[in-house]
């Protein structure tokens, strides 16, 4: 996985107003992705959560025809918003949700 720069984060998620953003994306052949965002307000975080949901939907549509075996990861994507923070994780298994749920 590679860390995305600010321009890529904005292109992928439509988020340009985060106080902090860290996004790691796979090479493109797989769907794994993790993103953490921090915002000034809960309203901004809620908006980013909706943008993340749209990102996952778009990825699902792309992978259905490109690499269909990756769709399960997208179907089980974890998107959590707590206060001013948003976390997104696309990976195998339930571990991601269990780990993120401890912090969100």
For each feature predicted by the language model, list its residue ranges.
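Short, compositionally biased low-complexity segments enriched in polar/charged residues
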Residues: 1-31, 43, 47, 74
């Amino acid at each position: 996985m590679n860390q995305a720069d600010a321009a890529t984060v904005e292109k992928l998620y439509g988020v340009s107003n985060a106080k902090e953003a860290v996004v790691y994306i796979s090479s493109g052949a797989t769907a794994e992705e993790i993103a953490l965002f921090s915002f000034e307000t809960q309203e901004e975080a809620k908006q980013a959560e909706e943008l993340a949901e749209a990102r996952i939907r778009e990825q699902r549509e792309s992978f259905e025809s490109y690499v269909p075996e990756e769709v399960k990861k997208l179907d089980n994507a974890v998107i959590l918003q707590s206060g001013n923070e948003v976390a997104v994780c696309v990976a195998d298994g339930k571990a991601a949700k269990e780990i993120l749920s401890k912090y969100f």
